[in-house]
Structure formats: structure tokens, C-alpha cells
Curated annotation (Swiss-Prot):
The keyword Repeat applies. The gene is ORF50. Residues 205-225, 363-395, 471-482, 490-503, 525-634 have a biased composition (Low complexity). Sequence repeats lie at residues 143-158, 171-186, 200-214, 215-233, 234-252, 253-268, 279-293, 294-309, 320-334, 335-349, 362-376, 377-391, 392-406, 407-421, 422-436, 437-452, 464-477, 478-493, 504-517, 518-531, 532-545, 546-559, 560-573, 574-587, 588-601, 602-615, 616-629. Residues 53-83, 187-225, 339-395, 471-503, 525-670 are annotated as: Disordered. It comes from Ictalurid herpesvirus 1 (strain Auburn) (IcHV-1). Coiled coil: none annotated. This is Uncharacterized protein ORF50. Disulfide bonds: none annotated. Residues 342-362 have a biased composition (Polar residues). Signal peptide: none annotated. Residues 638-654 have a biased composition (Basic residues). Keywords: Repeat. It comes from the Viruses.
Length: 670
């Protein structure tokens, strides 16, 4: 028995009346022959026509959308519309019995089950079911790069824990041949949040970027205001631009124009091949703040920052890296002390109410100069103060300055002041100063070592470094054991201590600045490290921060952007092992060409951890931004892994492109 459903006439008339489009045909055949039973044939034809009613099938060898062959012998009088505006599905079902099919002249007895074109004279369609289907699609479009040959890739792993949130916003870089890759693994703990925001800066003038935490504008008289929660919009690159946002924290990139304002301080050495390393501590309720300003303005600069997230609960780690050219700045700040409410800028012990301030002046202007400052741990008493200043190196070549400040005595209200005169201006000179220990009485004053009593002050000043090449300045200060002591190098084991280390930029080439401080093991400590930017070429900034083992620790590292070309910024943050840890990484854009920004954040092992990474776009050409954030391994379920790689080549800057979104990697949960 043969069943023919014929509706083509009615639908054809309605299609012609409504001026619908039929332009090309997509045809598929399904032949099913049950045994025993009738043969069932299902033919589905999708037709799209263009608006020209006089067009012939030969005028359109294939559909404009699908590229398939048209149906032969379609009436040339059918109206045609623009491809993809309308699609018509024509279905034909024929159920055949055991008797033979009536023979029609020019029509084969079987329907070929193939996609090959059919001879126009071989098929005669007697019945069709026509269904009009109009589909409107809104694809997920990633961010479009504003430059030429730019690439923006984003892969986001879905959080494996309960109530986890993973947000990623990435704007495309505005330079040519720039690549921005971000891979973020969602935390595996419960109530964990992983937020990664990468914003490009608009390249036009009078542009406005409103969202949250914009980078600082690169034009003159620009303003960047914001309070950031998760999103860091790109800042305009033109003049008189405004970027306003609302968020919890604001870490704008450094402004490149005049009268601009930024939240980044200190300069890295201005010489070539300078090195500055910073390693941050960890403790319970500790705070570690490391600021590594913009790298030198030369080419081929490298900035590396490795920050271990605190292992306690409610820990926070922030890292912002700069960019410059082939200079090296190395600052090492060990873990924080074991006391409560301690603050250290380099490394501070477990004492209470202690203050440590360490200042290392600019490096020499010659080549191959070395400045080494070592500050031992401060005393175990409370309210101690130790101040050590190491001036610039001498102007000769191959000079060495070594200053050693022993531990202060155990008396109370003692003061230790050590001054090392400037080094000679000749070559191969060496200055070594060692001050003996201060007496153990109260209210004592010593030129080198301070007693262990309370309310003692130790001040050590090293001479100015020579301007020649190959000079070395070394300062070592032992911690006092009394209370109320303040040290500029190492802070005691009491609580509520502060350690601050500031290193000025060296103006020579091949200079090295090294600051090492022992880590405090107490809680509520703060470590702050500020390094001035080097203006020379081939500078490297490396910051390594060890994770605090206490709870509620905070690690903050801020590095301003280098203005030179071919700069490299690398940030690595180890996972905090405690619960409720927070890791925040902010990287300002390098303004030079061929710059590389790499940020790697290890997962916090506790629950309720937060990982936030903000990377501004490199404003030069051939810049690469790579951000990899591992998931926290605390409470929750699932695992996320992400890897990002970016490479760019070329020169110049591209125009601004439209904003884009992102889509998750195949297989990832949204």
C-alpha cells in the first residue's frame, strides 16, 4: 500500500502569497525496508530561495548557506529572498506496499539514497509537506582583538565545589600581533570563588570604559577611579579619557601620560642587567604587601614574581607585576613572624608592637655593581625599633661595601646607631664596618648593636654606593631581643611589628640589589616590600613569596608596568594551605612592544578560598599575556586545570575592536 501526503499545493500558494524565500535545496533520504512489511521512504528537503522570481535553478548551483545542490525543476516563478533569512523544510513520506510502484515516465522506480545531484528529468515530486523554519542564532563571540593578527583565547574550568563561582572577562589587546591567553581552573573547595579579569585598554581618544577597576589611562590628564569586585575594565589609551568602576579593590595600571594617578610606588634600578628579588612571608592573620614598581624603560626587560599563598585561613595574596627591558631586580622577603598583629616589609619576627624599616638607596651608576643587604630577625620583645639605611655605592669600579650590625643588647630603652661613610671613588675599593654589641643596661645607646630591653632603637646607615662598576654593598643587622624595639631590617618575634624595605633604583648597568629577611611565624603580621623601577635596559624583576603557614594571612605584591620594549613579567603564586584564603594577582600592562606578562596562581588547599587575577593589556605590539590559575584543593568536589600560552610577533598598534565575550572550553561547565 502506498501512502502519499500531499500538501505542496496549499503550502506553495501560501508561500507565494507571503513572499517567502526559496533559494537552494538541502535534501536527505532515509530508506527503511522492514522485513516483512512495506518499504518506507522519508525525504526531507530544505529549500532556501532568493528574491529574484525570474532566476532559474541553473543560476544558483548551490545554496549560499549550506553549499548544497538545488532541487531540479523547481518552479522559476517562486520568490527568492536573501540566503539564511528563511529556510523551508519540505518533507515527503512514501509508504510502499508489496505491489510495484506505478511507473511514471522519466522517474526511476527507486529513490537514490545519496547526496549526489539528481538528474533534473529523473525525479518528479508529487507530494510534499512544507514547513517554514526561521532560525535566529546569537553565537558566543569571544573578545575581538583590536590589532592585526591578534589572538584571544580563554579556557575556563567549571568550579567543582559547592556554591563556587568562576568568572572570566578578557578584553582583546589593542596592539598588533598581540596574544592574550587565560586559563583558569575553578577552585575545588566549597564556597570558593575564582575570578579572573583581563581588560584591554581602548586605543582611541576620549574613550570611556565603565565597569570595575580600570587600569590607569595612558594619555594625559586621565582619571582612573574605581572600586573593584571582580571585573577590571580596560582603561582608555587616548587623552582626557575616563574609566570609572565600582569594586572592592582597585589596582590601576601605572599611567603613561602626564598628571595621571596610580596606586603603584617605587622604582626598580635604572641600570642594565639589574636584579631585584622579593620573597614574601606567611603567618596567621598576617599581611604581606610587596610592591615592585614599573620595570626599566629599556628593551628586553624581565620581571618574575613568585608568591606562595599563605597556608592559614582567610589569607590574601596580591601580586601586580611591571614591565621594562632586560633589567633585573631581586628582593627576597621571607615568611612573616609567629607573633600576632605583626607587620613586616621584608621579614619580621614574632615580637609585639615592633617596627622594622629597611632602606637600600639607589644602585651605582657603573656596571656590574652589587648591593647586598641582609637583615636578621628582630628581638623577641615588644615595641622595638631598628632602622638600617644603606646609601648608594661608590663611583669607582669593583667597589665593595660591607656593613654588619650585630644584635642589640637586652637592656631597655636602648638605641643603636650605625653609620658607614661613603665608599671611595676609586676602583676595587672595599669598606667593611662592624659595630660591637650594645650593653645590656637600660636607656643605653650603641653605634651598632642594641640591647634586648624595651623601647630600644637601632639605627644603621650605610654609605652611598660608588658610581663605578662592580661595586658591592652588604648590610647585615641582627634582631634585638628587647621590647618596643624597631628595626629597619629584621623585626623581632613580638606581635604588631612592622618591617619596611625600600630599594631605590640603580642608574648603572649590571647592578644587583638583594634583600633577604627571615620569615615571621606569628599571626597578624604584615610584610611590605617596595622596589623602585629600573630605567635601563635588560632589567629583571623577580618576586618570590613563600606561603604563610598561619591563618588569616595576607600577601600583597604590586608591580608597576615597565615602559620599555620586549619586557617580560612573570608572576607565580603558590596555593595557600589554609581555609578561606584569598589570592589576588594584578598585573599592569607593559607599555613597550614585544612584552610578555605571565601569571601563574597555584590553588589554595583550604575551603572558601578566593583566587582573583587581573591582567591589563600590554600596550605595545607583539605582547603576550598568559594567566594560569590553579583551583584551590579544599572542601568541595571536582578538579579544574588550566593552561594559557600567548605569543605575539610584529610591530605597531592595531585599532580598537568591538568588545567581546568568552565561552568555556569544550567540556567545561558554565
Amino acid at each position: 500500500m502506498e501512502l502519499l501526503v500531499v500538501t505542496l499545493t496549499c503550502l506553495g500558494m501560501s508561500l507565494l502569497a507571503s513572499n517567502l524565500a526559496l533559494v537552494g535545496v538541502v535534501r536527505s533520504y532515509t530508506n527503511e525496508t522492514p522485513t516483512p512489511g512495506p518499504e518506507t521512504e522519508l525525504i526531507t528537503t530544505t529549500v532556501a530561495r532568493m528574491t529574484d522570481p525570474t532566476a532559474k535553478p541553473s543560476d544558483f548551483p548551490g545554496d549560499a548557506v549550506t553549499g548544497t545542490q538545488p532541487v531540479p525543476r523547481e518552479p522559476s516563478s517562486l520568490p527568492r529572498t536573501t540566503p539564511s533569512l528563511a529556510h523551508t523544510t519540505i518533507s515527503k513520506m512514501i509508504s510502499l506496499g508489496t505491489r510495484p510502484r506505478p511507473t511514471i515516465p522519466g522517474v526511476p522506480t527507486t529513490i537514490p539514497n545519496t547526496d549526489a545531484p539528481v538528474d533534473p528529468g529523473s525525479v518528479h515530486t508529487t507530494a510534499r509537506v512544507v514547513t517554514d523554519i526561521t532560525t535566529k542564532q546569537t553565537p558566543t563571540t569571544p573578545a575581538t582583538p583590536a590589532g592585526a593578527n591578534d589572538t584571544a583565547n580563554i579556557t575556563t574550568a567549571t568550579p567543582a565545589g559547592a556554591n563556587d563561582t568562576a568568572n572570566i572577562t578578557t578584553a582583546t589587546p589593542a596592539g598588533a600581533n598581540d596574544t592574550a591567553n587565560i586559563t583558569t581552573a575553578t577552585p575545588a573547595g566549597a564556597n570558593d570563588t575564582a575570578v579572573t579579569t583581563t581588560s584591554a585598554t581602548p586605543a582611541g581618544a576620549n574613550d570611556t570604559a565603565v565597569t570595575t577597576t580600570p587600569a590607569t589611562p595612558a594619555g594625559a590628564n586621565d582619571t582612573a577611579n574605581g572600586t573593584v569586585v571582580t571585573t577590571t575594565p580596560a582603561m582608555p589609551a587616548g587623552a582626557n579619557d575616563t574609566a570609572n568602576g565600582t569594586a572592592v579593590t582597585t589596582t590601576p595600571a601605572m599611567p603613561a601620560g602626564a598628571n595621571d594617578t596610580a596606586n603603584i610606588t617605587t622604582a626598580t634600578p635604572t641600570g642594565a642587567n639589574d636584579t631585584a628579588n622579593v620573597t614574601m612571608p606567611a603567618g596567621a592573620t598576617d599581611t604581606v604587601v610587596t610592591t615592585t614598581p614599573a620595570m626599566p624603560t629599556g628593551a628586553n626587560d624581565t620581571a618574575n614574581i613568585t608568591t606562595a599563598t599563605p597556608a592559614g585561613a582567610n589569607d590574601t595574596a596580591n601580586v601586580t607585576m611591571p614591565a621594562g627591558a632586560t633589567d633585573t631586580v631581586v628582593t627576597t622577603t621571607p615568611a612573616m613572624p609567629a607573633g600576632a598583629n605583626d607587620t613586616a616589609n621584608v621579614t619580621k619576627p614574632a615580637g609585639s608592637t615592633d617596627t622594622v624599616v629597611t632602606t637600600t638607596p639607589a644602585m651605582p651608576t657603573g656596571a656590574t655593581d652589587t648591593v647586598v643587604t641582609t637583615t636578621p630577625a628582630m628581638p623577641t620583645g615588644a615595641t622595638d625599633t631598628v632602622v638600617t639605611t644603606t646609601p648608594a655605592m661608590p663611583t669607582g669600579a669593583t667597589d665593595t661595601v660591607v656593613t654588619t650590625t650585630p644584635a642589640k643588647p637586652a637592656g631597655a630603652n636602648g638605641t643603636v646607631v650605625t653609620t658607614t661613610p661613603a665608599m671611595p671613588a676609586g676602583a676595587n675599593d672595599t669598606v667593611v664596618t662592624t659595630a660591637p654589641a650594645t650593653p645590656a643596661g637600660a636607656n643605653d645607646t650603641a653605634n651598632v648593636t642594641k640591647p634586648t630591653g624595651a623601647t630600644d632603637t637601632v639605627v644603621t646607615t650605610a654609605t652611598v654606593k660608588p658610581t663605578g662598576a662592580t661595586g658591592t654593598v652588604t648590610t647585615t643587622t641582627a634582631k634585638p631581643t628587647g621590647a618596643n624595639d624597631t628595626a629597619n631590617v629584621t623585626k623581632p618575634t613580638g606581635a604588631t611589628g612592622t618591617v619596611t624595605t625600600t630599594t631605590a633604583k640603580p642608574t648603572g648597568a649590571t647592578g644587583t640589589v638583594t634583600v633577604a629577611t627571615a620569615k615571621p611565624t606569628g599571626a597578624t603580621g604584615t610584610v611590605t616590600t617596595t622596589t623602585a623601577k629600573p630605567t635601563g635596559a635588560n632589567g629583571t624583576v623577580t618576586t618570590t613569596t613563600a606561603k604563610p603557614t598561619g591563618a588569616t594571612g595576607t600577601v600583597t605584591t604590586t608591580t608597576a608596568k615597565p615602559t620599555g620594549a620586549n619586557g617580560t613579567v612573570t608572576t607565580t603564586t603558590a596555593k595557600p594551605a589554609g581555609a578561606n584564603g584569598t589570592v589576588t594577582t594584578t598585573t599592569a600592562k607593559p607599555a613597550g612592544a614585544n612584552g610578555t606578562v605571565t601569571t601563574t596562581t597555584a590553588k589554595p588547599a583550604g575551603a572558601n578560598g578566593t583566587v582573583t587575577t587581573t591582567t591589563a593589556k600590554p600596550a605595545g605590539a607583539n605582547g603576550t599575556v598568559t594567566t594560569t590559575t590553579a583551583k584551590p584543593a579544599g572542601a568541595g568536589h571536582g578538579h579544574g586545570h588550566g593552561h594559557g600560552h600567548g605569543h605575539g610577533h610584529g610591530h605597531g598598534h592595531g585599532g580598537r575592536g568591538p568588545p567581546g565575550g568568552h565561552k568555556p572550553k569544550s567540556g567545561a561547565r558554565r
